[in-house]
Amino acid sequence: LNIEFWICGICNSDDYKIELKNKVRTDNVIFDFRFINNGEIPSLLSKVDIVLIPYNVESSLNSGVAILAFSYAKTVISTEIGTVLDFLDSGMVYVYNNSQNDELKNTLCSIYDEIQKDSHFLEVKGSGMLEYVRKHNNVDFIKKELAKVYL
């Protein structure tokens, strides 16, 4: 199985860029430390199978990136932020606690094992999540759910 990891997006500091690069001891990690324009997102998402969102849970609640990844039928692994936790009952997203070092590694290994058993595993997960989002973010569905709470 040929795996590449892409680390994309703006870094807060040059020190953080250097720290990330120093931690990598393999040639299959690609760094792209720049702002990703909206026009580039479809092309970038078409090249990946999984979107890993390692947000700081103390400063992030929601993620447009997660919703966008779901919209492109991509499997998402994320820290425990509100957006992703809202979709946890779908059984199609992966959530990890970023204070537990082995939790992300274990999640990645678990996904790798599933891919070994079924090469279409990620497509099935991604497509399932896309359908889940379409159903649960449907205007009529949301109206009904809000009516249950407020009426």
Placement of each model-derived feature along the sequence:
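Short hydrophobic beta-strand element within catalytic cores of glycosyltransferases
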Residues: T75-S78
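Acidic, amphipathic alpha-helical patches
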Residues: N38-I41, V65, V84, L104
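Short alpha-helix at the nucleotide-sugar/activated-sugar donor binding site of glycosyltransferases
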Residues: A69-S71
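A charged, aromatic-enriched C-terminal amphipathic alpha-helix characteristic of glycosyltransferases
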Residues: S99, Q116-Y150
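Nucleotide-activated donor-binding/catalytic signature segment of Leloir-type glycosyltransferases, i.e.
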Residues: G9, K17-P42
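Short alpha-helical donor nucleotide-sugar binding micro-motif in glycosyltransferases
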Residues: S43-V48
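Nucleotide-sugar-dependent
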Residues: I53-I67, E80-I81, L85-D86
